[in-house]
Curated annotation (Swiss-Prot):
Residues 235-404 form the PCI domain. The modification N-acetylserine is found at residue 2. Changing residue 132 to L: In rpn6-2; temperature-sensitive mutant that shows defects in proteasome assembly when incubated at 37 degrees Celsius. This is 26S proteasome regulatory subunit RPN6. Keywords: Acetylation, Proteasome. It comes from the Eukaryota. N-acetylated by NAT1. It comes from Saccharomyces cerevisiae (strain ATCC 204508 / S288c).
């Protein structure tokens, strides 16, 4: 008769040999055997070694289903695995169940299955009166609803959790839930509530020690909200802090998050028209040697187009890196403003050598409709981006040099204003005397 330890080794050997179906049967038989033995020893405590073997078997079988891509089997196994966890300590049950659910993240297109598994696990937690487990899984479920874009469901869970955590004065959980609430409101474009939630998260975080990942997420969210306010200088400083935090992490998604934040850092510098800073960041040792992705390449192409004031290069970069640029909500939301800025910059570059130029010639160079170019030039003149006059009858644009305002006029106006005040005061005093 083989011992559980030897069967565990046998299952691992089969996994290494890619005999996944056989390995699955060994793991299941090991769990069923342990379960039956636990039942037979009614009232007797199961030794720590057997519990550790059960825990290992559950986690390794979950990983096996991920490796196999057996989404349906993993969906069925996780709720079923709670039967084996009845003998576990409460803290260990939380750890094992959360680890199994997190493994689902590695399976593509499994968001609905993750939600189903979370809901079933919450039912188990309520049934067994595991309050801490229920809270932990509810946060996970609210996050999954957020990822699924089911914002109403996510907010309903968040509101319930906030009430409970405030009663318990659970600061770490309050930080996580307020941060998630801020993300949800940001997606709903309610920036005022998003900022309020983020402020609440930071207030709770100030009184406790926060894990590096939480600090990184708080800084990232702060940077995003400052970007929405077009305060790109402050946004960059938050993104930089977030990037440093992710850079020092070794979690499974820390590299991807660091690349994402680095992309936002470059976006901030582009929006500030600090292209030299973009080049310095791209040429930095950590960027060249560690962080390379299509998202960063996309921002590099946009920066070059912006530096050259070339709308054609900008549109080329947009087509080449459409997924990386338009698939990200933050970059997409800022691209209209970036397009307008680049269009203005490109038009200024074209008209720079001329005193008088045909609008049709500008339209031909920039590759846009004549009417569209004329409308934009008219707007730029009104905004005093450059000084000129449109001759619509002939289709010409007259460009003038920017007038130098004489400081003497301002001084004279100020002097007249002060004299006016003195005269008014003298008049008031005279009226009192008479």
């Amino acid at each position: 008769m083989s011992l559980p330890g030897s069967k565990l080794e046998e299952a691992r050997r089969l996994v290494n040999e890619k005999q996944y179906n056989e390995a699955e049967q060994v793991y299941l038989s090991l769990l069923d055997k342990d379960s039956s033995q636990s039942s037979a020893a009614a009232g007797a405590s199961v030794d720590d070694k057997r519990r550790n073997e059960q825990e290992t078997s559950i986690l390794e079988l979950g990983q096996l289903y991920v490796t196999m891509g057996a989404k349906d089997k993993l969906r069925e196994f996780i709720p079923h695995s709670t039967e084996y966890m009845m003998q576990f300590a409460k803290s260990k049950t939380v750890k094992v169940l959360k680890t199994l659910i997190e493994k689902f993240e590695q399976v593509p297109d499994s968001l609905d299955d993750q939600i189903f598994v979370c809901e079933k696990s919450i039912e188990f937690a309520k049934r067994e009166k595991r309050v801490f487990l229920k809270h932990s899984l509810s946060i996970k479920l609210a996050t999954l609803h957020y990822q699924k874009k089911q914002y109403k469901d996510s907010l309903a869970l968040i509101n319930d959790l906030l009430r409970e955590f405030k009663k318990l004065d659970d600061k770490p959980s309050l930080v996580d839930v307020h941060l998630l609430e801020s993300k949800v409101y940001h997606k709903l474009r309610n920036l005022a509530k998003s900022k309020a939630s983020l402020t609440a998260a930071r207030t709770a975080a100030n009184s406790i020690y926060c894990p590096t990942q939480t600090v990184a997420e708080l800084d990232l969210m702060s940077g995003i909200l400052h970007c929405e306010d077009k305060d790109y200088k402050t946004a960059f400083s938050y993104f930089f802090e977030s990037f440093e935090s992710y850079h020092n992490l070794t979690t499974h998604n820390s590299y991807e998050k660091a690349c994402q934040v680095l992309k936002y850092m470059l976006l901030s510098k582009i929006m500030l028209n600090l292209i030299d800073d973009v080049k310095n960041i791209l040429n930095a040792k950590y960027t060249k040697e560690t962080y390379q992705s299509r998202g960063i390449d996309a921002m590099k192409a946009v920066a070059e187009a912006y530096n050259n004031r070339s709308l054609l290069d900008f549109n080329t970069a947009l087509k080449q890196y459409e997924k990386e640029l338009m698939g990200d909500e933050l970059t997409r939301s800022h691209f209209n403003a970036l397009y307008d800025t680049l269009l203005e910059s490109n038009l200024c570059k074209i008209i720079e050598p001329f005193e008088c130029v045909e609008i049709s010639h500008i339209s031909k160079i920039i590759g846009l409709d004549t009417q569209q170019v004329e409308g934009k030039l008219s707007q730029m003149i009104l905004d005093k981006i450059f000084y000129g006059v449109l001759d619509q009858g002939n289709g010409w644009l007259y460009v003038y040099e920017t007038p130098n305002q004489d400081a003497t006029y301002d001084s004279a106006l100020e002097l007249v204003g002060q004299l006016n005040k003195v005269v008014d005061q003298l008049f008031e005093k005279a009226s009192v005397l008479y």
